[in-house]
Amino acid sequence: MSTSSAPAAIGPYSQAVRVGDLLYTSGQVALDPATGQMISGGIEAQTVRVLENLKAVIEAAGTDLSNVVKTVVFLKNMGDFGAMNAVYGQYLAPNGVVAPARSTVEVARLPKDALVEIEVIARL
């Protein structure tokens, strides 16, 4: 599945794949959907863009962020964990909503030198 409301894939992969009643997204980095370029700004700005990209992908599949059951977060620097969490919580655990299961790992490098990449599994 694919939507123009999120950045086009930068490799041979799909934005998301449906398997039964689950949607598996590819990881999203902070690319502007209109230009395909990395946005400027720090971890907070990049996390917002990543989550907006993911929101566009899962909404195109007919679901929304409230149906996300699992995420994997890749950080270039674990020192950004707190700042990323502050933004992440606004999208995936607003107003005390139970947050999805999650793994977070630090990696040496991300595509386009992103600071954060997130992938999700959501119910349809």
Where are these regions (language model features)?
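Short, polar/acidic, helix-capping and beta-turn segments at strand->helix junctions
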Residues: M1-L124
